[in-house]
């Protein structure tokens, strides 16, 4: 957090496939976040979380941060950084320990979570998040906060989110070369869920789907706890590439066509428009029918949504075998830039057979005209996450303590290498 003229400021930085966004929020006395600065730069040098041109990424970060600093009238020294890639992995684990005294203490909780996370994870991966799902004391299960309760043995179920260490190192390196400290790296899907989901939805059971440019992030909450997280390495950009390939148009022209004429389902008969490429999108002497373009878009969106539904059904079957609750009474919540295409709600309802909501960031004030669109769910969520780190005395602080050692390892690696 940054202190500027007695203001408590938190900064989120999203380095995505399509854009680099810096968002500055002031944490008000009532705990709300007021947006006071934003910087946006078109991404260059990164694709689906992997850096392929470090200098280009650094340049984008600097430009984005500079814009936000001017608008917020502050100097940014540290950020909360989002991360999404196919190299993100998740697993649910269990830890069991005896209760040391007559009642559960914070030390008992630290011990049981340490036991739960001391498991084998993928090679070259580090634990990014350790998120408690529920505690059990002796025969009593479903406990959210066991502090002060009596018993002889405590069990915890946790959700682990891990990432490839080199992927994280490279993104952190890019930020630190801009003389900016990384307060914490946060899985993008987790950040987005903080921005768009309500407490009731999480308790009822909900799957949040953030459809970005390079990746789709999934987070599933059951009974208020995260049960599954997943990254699909295909998203909005592949739709643009399909249009480019099908109609021999440039990538930038295809993106414009997708945004202006795209739809996730076929149009009503007689409503298709003629797309004159020669006058609108360059020097092509070519016309397209909107229906033809939509066929390409609809096919790809159907494929992407079916991939997501397969994951949802897999998790449902797995939890059912474990004898655990699995209901998405809260439905499906879609967000991210690629969720704004026309008629996506209708398309998704056919595939998921559940109620669908297209979500914008919640619980913010200030420069809301700039960021209250699905495109900014992740970076707004980073601010909510950062705020909780400072003001929540329970779960968030416990989670942070478990990744401090990981950040120390990252820091030590930098010192050795550079």
Swiss-Prot record:
The record's listing under SMART domains reads: FtsA
Record membrane topology? Peripheral membrane protein
- The answer to whether keyword Signal applies is no
Q: Which domain of life is it from?
A: Bacteria
Is Amino-acid biosynthesis among this UniProt entry's keywords?
no
Pfam families the record matches: FtsA, SHS2_FTSA
Q: Write out the entry's keywords from A to Z.
A: Cell cycle, Cell division, Cell inner membrane, Cell membrane, Membrane
Record localization:
Cell inner membrane
Record GO cellular component, one term: cell division site
A Gene Ontology BP annotation from the UniProt entry: FtsZ-dependent cytokinesis
Q: How does this polypeptide assemble, per the annotation?
A: Self-interacts. Interacts with FtsZ.
Describe the task this protein carries out: Cell division protein that is involved in the assembly of the Z ring. May serve as a membrane anchor for the Z ring.
Please state which protein family the record places this protein in: Belongs to the FtsA/MreB family.
Q: Return the HAMAP family for the record.
A: FtsA
- Name of protein: Cell division protein FtsA
